[in-house]
């Protein structure tokens, strides 16, 4: 492995050392952070950003730029240093000095919604690799639609040993290898150090063999040899497969006492060691000062991308006006005008057809109407296509050799699927959605949480949403999952009660450009309760009266999804006993709680008896109906039996709801 001292400094070294010392100084000033990776991977980043990557700091969101994902998000100062050095205007030296401080553009881990030039938020290891897979998929999908003269770029990721230890890396590697994502290149910072010590204490996997077995091209280079790094990257660009490049590096490169040790991973070097490191690498500039030669070299590299961007703009301008407008619309994320008509049409069909339909089937019906109207939608499923009903009529499957389709077979890779959808949404130009069993949303949770944090439009169709799925039993019956999903900030959770509400919830999900959505759908058939087929979206209110009382309400029943029809039955029982009863359908806690307090109070009403019913745990309901309301639902795991027997066994019946309301009236 190369070893460079102050006596053998090259121009490359000066550029790489600028990264190292900005990272060292920022971590020291913050008294917090991870200097080891930026010091060790500086040579990789320098080659990539000065010799290979296609980008223009003056246009951070240029659609045909190459994407770079720092999967090892703890090494954020590597990326912040590069952005500052390359000329991203907002990442000033003052922001570098404010590393990890409240309100800075340089938070502890990269956040794409905070800092221009950051393609995705990373930090939870493994997420970045799988997100990069989604970005590479988006590039192929859009190129198939608009041509390679408009869409032709690479996705690069820098991953750590920890990234490759995470299970999601295998899901991502399998999917990328199968789809032959040749424009995906992952650089592995192979420093053989983990927080606890050498990686050998916890693993001995041959990572290159693992990725090769998944269909990847692989290479191993000295991560401190710029010529070897460049050659490997050029070979990767020419490959017909995704590529993993193992870059053997020394963590904390240049530190006389801490290089190669876990001690440099997540702690400041300390003043004495910084002085020694400056001497070892021949860096005489004081803290946060980049010598003119190094800064000029970096700024020239950043400015070099302008020509590629302008050439792309010229090619794009030569395309027909209608095609340009469609591409720009999709990248901007605006919806076509045809969506509203499609939603009304599916409502009209539902009302005309009537009958009981599982909301998973309702969702399929909606997709048949809206996917032709919104061609940027790209669906998929985790090997449950026929159960989730996420493949619209006429949808063509994506294959390794043909990305003109709009449906992706993700296989049993829920976590990788969710993260890949994040990457597709971040890329822009597509609206990803996919299906899975609701109970397995636990497998998706880290990626769903990141989508919510980033505010990305990603749609999760989660079916088989309760004990109503029946015989498969408690391993597959969600009980706590609604509460768990509702606990994620900025995630829109919607549980429609029939086909009309399902159509409305799909419309809301598509219109929610700044947050992900989860559509919670039933396996069992549900009666049509809504008979209006207008453009008015009642579900957007979050909660509304779906059945009025015969007089001043003495009881108010609140329900979601499959339990709304049960509440309607209970209301009829109560009305038969002379108790005027109303029913409120709550399509979404989040939408309801966003309404003004006075509006919420009006919907909840002042009936002396209030009962909420949902085939799930109570957690979260008190914020809607108050702690004094009765609740009919689950307090344990489910069981294996037909759905109707399970509802009776667990006491989730119209009779029980009515009884609880009468109990409350007697106590009033």
UniProtKB/Swiss-Prot annotation:
GO terms for molecular function: metal ion binding; transketolase activity. InterPro entries: THDP-binding, Transketo_C/PFOR_II, Transketolase-like_C_2, Transketolase-like_Pyr-bd, Transketolase_bac-like, Transketolase_BS, Transketolase_CS, Transketolase_fam. Pathway: Carbohydrate biosynthesis; Calvin cycle. It catalyses: D-sedoheptulose 7-phosphate + D-glyceraldehyde 3-phosphate = aldehydo-D-ribose 5-phosphate + D-xylulose 5-phosphate. Thiamine diphosphate binds at residues 74, 123-125, 162, 191, 265, 440. Binds 1 thiamine pyrophosphate per subunit. Keywords: Calcium, Calvin cycle, Magnesium, Metal-binding, Thiamine pyrophosphate, Transferase. The active site is at 414 (proton donor). Its EC number is 2.2.1.1. GO terms for biological process: pentose-phosphate shunt; reductive pentose-phosphate cycle. Pfam families: Transket_pyr, Transketolase_C_1, Transketolase_N. GO terms for cellular component: cytosol. The record marks 34, 265 as: Important for catalytic activity. Its cofactor is Mg(2+); thiamine diphosphate. PROSITE patterns: TRANSKETOLASE_1, TRANSKETOLASE_2. Substrate binds at residues 34, 265, 360, 387, 464, 472, 523. Mg(2+) binds at residues 161, 191, 193. Catalyzes the transfer of a two-carbon ketol group from a ketose donor to an aldose acceptor, via a covalent intermediate with the cofactor thiamine pyrophosphate. Belongs to the transketolase family. This is Transketolase 1. It comes from Xanthobacter flavus. The gene is tkt.
């Amino acid at each position: 492995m190369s070893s460079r001292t102050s006596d053998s400094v090259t121009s490359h070294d000066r550029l790489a050392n600028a990264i190292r010392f900005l990272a060292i100084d920022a971590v020291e000033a913050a008294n917090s952070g991870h200097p080891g990776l930026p010091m060790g991977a500086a040579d990789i980043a320098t080659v990539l950003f000065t010799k290979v990557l296609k980008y223009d700091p003056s246009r951070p969101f240029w659609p045909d730029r190459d994407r770079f994902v720092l999967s090892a998000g703890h090494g954020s100062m590597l990326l912040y240093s590069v952005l500052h050095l390359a000329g991203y205007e907002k990442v000033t030296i003052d922001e570098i000095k404010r590393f990890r401080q409240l309100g800075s553009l340089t938070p502890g881990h990269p956040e794409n919604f905070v800092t221009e030039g950051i393609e995705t938020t990373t930090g939870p290891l493994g997420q970045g690799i799988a997100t990069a897979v989604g970005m590479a998929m988006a590039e192929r999908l859009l190129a198939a639609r608009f041509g390679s003269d408009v869409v032709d770029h690479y996705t690069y990721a820098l991953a750590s040993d920890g990234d490759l230890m995470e299970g999601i890396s295998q899901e991502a590697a399998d999917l990328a290898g199968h789809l032959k994502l040749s424009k995906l290149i992952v650089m592995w910072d192979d420093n053989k150090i983990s927080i606890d010590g050498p990686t050998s204490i916890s693993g001995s996997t041959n990572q290159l063999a693992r990725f090769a077995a998944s269909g990847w091209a692989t290479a191993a280079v000295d991560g401190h040899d710029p010529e070897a790094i460049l050659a490997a990257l050029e070979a990767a660009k020419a490959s017909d497969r995704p590529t993993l490049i193992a870059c053997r590096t020394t963590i904390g490169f240049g530190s006389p006492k801490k290089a190669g040790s876990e001690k440099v991973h997540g702690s400041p070097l300390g003043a004495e060691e910084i002085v020694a490191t400056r001497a070892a690498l021949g860096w005489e500039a004081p803290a946060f000062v980049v010598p003119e030669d190094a800064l000029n070299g970096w700024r020239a590299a950043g400015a070099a991308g302008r020509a590629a961007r302008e050439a792309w703009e010229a090619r794009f301008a030569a395309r027909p006006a209608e095609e340009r407008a469609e591409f720009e619309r999709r990248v901007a994320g605006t919806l076509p005008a045809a969506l509203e008509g499609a939603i009304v049409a599916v409502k009209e069909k539902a009302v005309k057809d009537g009958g009981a339909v599982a909301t998973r089937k309702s969702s399929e019906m909606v997709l048949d109407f809206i996917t032709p109207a919104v061609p940027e939608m790209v669906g998929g499923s985790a090997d449950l296509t026929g159960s989730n009903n996420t493949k619209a009529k006429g949808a063509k499957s994506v294959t390794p050799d043909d990305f003109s389709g709009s449906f992706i077979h993700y296989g049993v890779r829920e976590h990788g699927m969710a993260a890949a959808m994040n990457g597709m949404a971040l890329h822009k130009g597509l609206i990803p959605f996919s299906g899975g069993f609701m109970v397995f949303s636990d497998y998706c949770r880290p990626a769903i949480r990141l989508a919510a944090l980033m505010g990305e439009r990603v749609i999760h169709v989660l079916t088989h949403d309760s004990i109503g799925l029946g015989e498969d039993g408690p391993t597959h019956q969600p009980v706590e999952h609604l509460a768990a999903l509702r606990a994620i900030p900025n995630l829109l959770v919607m549980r429609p009660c029939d086909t009309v509400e399902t159509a409305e919830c799909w419309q809301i999900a598509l219109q929610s450009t700044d947050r992900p959505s989860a559509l919670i759908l039933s396996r069992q058939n549900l009666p049509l309760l809504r008979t209006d087929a207008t453009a008015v979206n009642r579900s957007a209110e979050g909660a509304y009266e779906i059945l009025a009382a015969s007089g001043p309400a003495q009881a108010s029943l609140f329900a979601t999804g499959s339990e709304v029809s049960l509440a309607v039955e209970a209301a009829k029982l109560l009305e038969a006993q002379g108790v005027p009863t109303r029913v409120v359908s709550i399509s979404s806690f989040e939408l309801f709680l966003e309404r003004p307090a006075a509006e919420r109070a009006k919907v909840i009403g002042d009936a002396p008896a209030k009962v909420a019913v949902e085939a799930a745990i109570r957690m979260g309901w008190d914020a809607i109906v108050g702690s004094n309301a009765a609740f009919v639902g689950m307090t344990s795991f489910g069981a294996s039996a037909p759905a109707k027997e399970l509802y009776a066994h667990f006491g989730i019946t119209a009779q029980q709801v009515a009884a609880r309301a009468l109990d409350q009236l007697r106590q009033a």
